[in-house]
């Protein structure tokens, strides 16, 4: 398998849906600023539960078409179940497919979206060349990566949060084929340039949430960030003192859980790498 999302003890569909719903308020703006043509054909590589594929399909209108691909059958079925019936037949389709071996003909789509997936693909340049193969000359390739810059989830505890983030980077070294996910995210621009994609606009978006948190925001921060990402998988990489401090702030039943604070806020960055032309030689 060419790409996997590691560490999903709660199940990948649940984790991905939580992240997408957390990002939903800003997703419309991010997609609108891409300027995708009405009636265009697009591909979502690593579509997850299909929410971004749905939003992209809505953006290109009733004459447009979006295909979402995932390497595992269960994820394709999950996307179909969650959003597959929300648009008229033919506008949104989900297929099994891999980012390094896309089941589409050459130059068959107007644009390609890859959201929070490229850093999971060990064969990065192979995937990017495959992206170029399926996008028509003059089309668009869009890579979205969350947390190229580190997020802030523990305001007032900067040193502890940095150590937790460092532990998470170390944990993803094996999952990332010897390079951490953070390193892969931060070298996205270099990877694009290495395959001849030099016409790249980079946009950064800063998501801000503050107390009282909405249900989707609380669900993502508590269950995906604190419990899944910063949970048992990091325990051996933190000192006992740091683990205890993390537990006091992050465990849902802790009276000191930071999400209980009326002053709580978080900052969460998203970076979009927008390649406006794919006409250069392969």
What are the language-model segments listed below?
Residues 2-12, 201-264:
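C-terminal helical/coil "lid" or tail adjacent to the Rossmann-like core of SAM-dependent
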Residues 21-38, 55:
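Conserved alpha-helix/loop element of class I SAM-dependent methyltransferases that forms part
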Residues 43, 49-101:
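Class I SAM-dependent methyltransferase SAM/SAH-binding core
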Residues 100-111:
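A short acidic, Gly/Pro-enriched loop at the edge of an enzyme's catalytic core
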Residues 125-140:
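A short glycine-rich, Lys/Arg-flanked "PGG" loop and its adjoining helix->strand segment in the class I
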Residues 142-215:
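Conserved catalytic/acceptor-binding region of the Class I
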Residues 195-198, 268-282:
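Core SAM-dependent methyltransferase catalytic element
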């Amino acid at each position: 398998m060419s790409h996997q999302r590691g560490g999903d003890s709660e199940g990948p569909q649940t984790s991905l849906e939580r992240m997408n719903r957390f990002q939903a308020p800003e997703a419309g703006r991010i997609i609108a600023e891409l300027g995708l043509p009405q009636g265009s054909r697009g591909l979502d590589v690593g579509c997850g539960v299909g929410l971004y594929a749905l939003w992209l399909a809505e953006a290109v209108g009733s004459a447009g078409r979006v295909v979402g691909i995932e390497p595992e059958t269960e994820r394709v079925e999950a996307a179909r179940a969650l959003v597959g019936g929300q648009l008229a037949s033919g506008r949104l389709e989900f297929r099994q497919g891999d980012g390094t071996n896309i089941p589409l003909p050459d130059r068959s789509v107007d644009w390609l979206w890859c959201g929070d997936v490229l850093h999971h693909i060990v064969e990065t340049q192979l995937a990017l060349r495959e992206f170029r193969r399926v996008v028509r000359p003059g089309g668009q390739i869009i890579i979205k990566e969350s947390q190229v810059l580190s997020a802030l989830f523990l305001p007032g505890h900067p040193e502890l949060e940095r150590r937790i983030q460092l532990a998470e980077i170390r944990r993803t070294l094996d999952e990332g084929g010897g390079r951490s996910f953070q390193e892969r995210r931060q070298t996205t621009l270099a990877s694009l340039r290495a395959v001849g994609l030099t016409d790249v606009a980079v946009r950064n978006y800063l998501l801000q949430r503050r107390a009282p948190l909405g249900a989707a925001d609380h669900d993502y921060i508590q269950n995906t960030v604190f419990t899944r990402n910063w949970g048992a998988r990091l325990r051996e990489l933190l000192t006992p003192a740091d683990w205890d401090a993390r537990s006091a702030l992050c465990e849902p039943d802790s009276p000191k859980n930071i999400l209980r604070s009326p002053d709580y806020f978080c900052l969460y960055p998203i970076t979009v790498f927008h390649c406006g032309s794919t006409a250069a030689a392969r």
